[in-house]
Amino acid sequence: REDDARDKGLRTSKLQYLPDYLGGKVRIEAGTELDALKAVPAIKTDRLSLTPLRKGDIPAYSALCLDDERNRWWGYDYRTDLGDKPLTENYFLDMAKADFAARRAVNFAVRLKGKLIGEVVLYRPDFRGGFEQGCRIAPEYAGHGYGTEAFAAAADWALYHLGLARVVAKCFKENEP
C-alpha cells in the first residue's frame, strides 16, 4: 500500500483502490434529554426551592464547593480540572454554567427561604435515558432532611417532567448513615 503522498486530510491511497464512489463525511452526535431544555427550571417543594445558580450565589456556592470535608463524599475534586490555573472567584459558577451550556449537567441551587444551602446535580448521561444525580447540603443545614427533600424533588422532575428512564445515585460506603 502506498502512503498519503503527504496530502493533508485526504488519503490518496483510498483512490488507488479505484472506488466507484467516495461518499461525504457524516457527523453524528449523541444527544440527551437535556438538549430540550432552554434554561434550568425552578422546582418547588414544601420547604425548598430548586433554582438556577446565579451570580449572587458565588460566595455561598464557592464555600460549598471548597468544603473538603463535605466534598470527599462528592466523588470529584475540582483541583483535577483546575490544574495549574489559578482558582478565581467565579470558577465554580462558570463551570456549572458551561456544563449546562454543553448539556453535560444541570445544577440546581437548593434554597431555603431564598438562601442557597446546597446543590443538586444531574450529570454523567449514559445516553440510554439515564443520568447520575448528586446532592450536597452545607454542613450548617445538614440533619434536617433538606438533602432528602431536594434529592427527591430533582429525581421526580427528571423522571416525570424531563422524561428520563432512570436516575442513578451512588454513595460511598463510608458515607452511609
State the predicted function of each range.
Residues 2-9, 169-177:
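Conserved beta-strand-loop-alpha-helix junction that forms the acyl-donor binding cleft
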Residues 24-25, 75, 151, 168-169:
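Residue-level detector of family-conserved "landmark" positions at structurally sensitive sites
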Residues 32-140, 156-157, 161, 167:
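GNAT-family acyltransferases
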Residues 9, 83, 128, 132, ...:
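Residues that form or flank phosphate/diphosphate-binding pockets in enzymes
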Residues 1, 137, 143-160, 176:
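Conserved acetyl-CoA-binding loop-helix of GNAT-fold acetyltransferases
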Residues 1-30:
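Aromatic (often tryptophan-rich) hydrophobic motifs at membrane interfaces
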